[in-house]
Amino acid sequence: MAVASRKLGALVLVAVLCLSLPTGCLSSQQAAALFIFGDSVFDPGNNNHINTHVNFKANFWPYGQSYFSSPTGRFSDGRIIPDFIAEYASLPIIPAYLEPNNDFTHGANFASAGAGALIASHAGLAVGLQTQLRYFGDLVDHYRQNLGDIKSRQLLSDAVYLFSCGGNDYQSPYYPYTQEQYVDIVIGNMTNVIKGIYEKGGRKFGVVNVPLIGCWPGMRAKQPGNTCNTEVDELTRLHNQAFAKRLEQLEKQLEGFVYAKFDLSTAILNRMKNPSKYGFKEGESACCGSGPFGGNYDCGRIKEFGLCDNATEYFFFDPFHPNELASRQFAEMFWDGDSMVTQPYNLKALFEGKPSTKYLPNDEL
């Protein structure tokens, strides 16, 4: 009886310790953790907890209406890409880092709407990429304190790190630099953050390229005659070409560095040009927003604004963000797509620890 009491007491103590640690108790059998960095494409609600302009928040109706019981701060009618990636990886939804009392056992989401690689991009209105890296460093210290050096190193090396960044940097004037110089500065800052994560133990990276936003509803609404903004798309093309080369260089320079790069830009353009092929009725106008193409960024931000009857029919939920259905489609492609969309590996390969298997197009398998 005394032995049984001691065993029960030990179990209770372990349970109490697990509940008292923000990182919980890691099991050797659990799925790899997921850490997320970037902008509004990946923001789960971090901006709810900073002092910023209403344009950088989405914690009000009708955001979240298609899935969540109340708005969460996601710039969507429902879930976003990281939510689906977590599901496919057998993980719970990864929590916002700035939300109080969250459990970071399975990772953390640092993404912030409006964030850029450059400190000047929406400074004071978003959590920039360098600050996100600093928050990650604080969490790494916490893991080491609670798990010890060996377990924390294992967690960090097994984890996958998602990135969506750069788009906000190209919506501001780049003078006095040339386009090439400006792109090089942006990519240099992104590279420094990736290397910073690598130095703390990260090895597996999932990145999306920057979408061509020049013809999006929110951009056309700002243009004379509601035309497309070709200059921002020129910069974005230069960025995507240069960043692809930089990732190849990092793979050669950094031992153990592997990555999955998803061509989000092409996936979006395909749905804008041929929405019915992908299950949408409208590919150019936003469900939520007033004015031409629903491009005025007033969704939920003023008393009267345009709102469609069925958000799933519109590729764009608001003037700058796709709906939940589109995010699910993108996540599926990112997760197990072939090399036509995700190179040189897909996320499934990274999570399963099989980065030695490269994926060929379906017609070459």
UniProtKB/Swiss-Prot annotation:
It catalyses: (Z,S)-pyrethrolone + (1R,3R)-chrysanthemoyl-CoA = pyrethrin I + CoA; (Z,S)-pyrethrolone + (1R,3R)-pyrethroyl-CoA = pyrethrin II + CoA; (Z,S)-jasmololone + (1R,3R)-chrysanthemoyl-CoA = jasmolin I + CoA; (Z,S)-cinerolone + (1R,3R)-chrysanthemoyl-CoA = cinerin I + CoA. It is an enzyme of class 3 (hydrolase). Optimum pH is 7.5. Its EC number is 3.1.1.-. The active site is at S40 (nucleophile), D318 (charge relay system), H321 (charge relay system). Induction: By wounding. Residues 1-27 form the signal peptide. Glycans are attached at N189, N310. Restricted to the pericarp during achene maturation. Expressed in the leaves of mature plants and seedlings, as well as in buds and flowers. Present in disk florets. GO terms for biological process: isoprenoid biosynthetic process; lipid catabolic process; response to wounding. The keyword Nucleotidyltransferase does not apply. Transmembrane segments: none annotated. Pathway: Isoprenoid biosynthesis. Keywords: Glycoprotein, Hydrolase, Lipid degradation, Lipid metabolism, Secreted, Signal. Its main location: secreted. Component of the monoterpenoid pyrethrins biosynthesis; pyrethrins are widely used plant-derived pesticide. Acyltransferase that catalyzes the esterification of terpene acids and lipid alcohol substrates into pyrethrins; mediates the transfer of a chrysanthemoyl moiety from the coenzyme A (CoA) thio-ester chrysanthemoyl CoA to pyrethrolone, and, to a lower extent, to jasmololone and cinerolone thus producing pyrethrins (e.g. pyrethrin type I). Can also use pyrethroyl CoA as substrate. Belongs to the 'GDSL' lipolytic enzyme family. This is GDSL lipase. It comes from Tanacetum cinerariifolium (Dalmatian daisy).
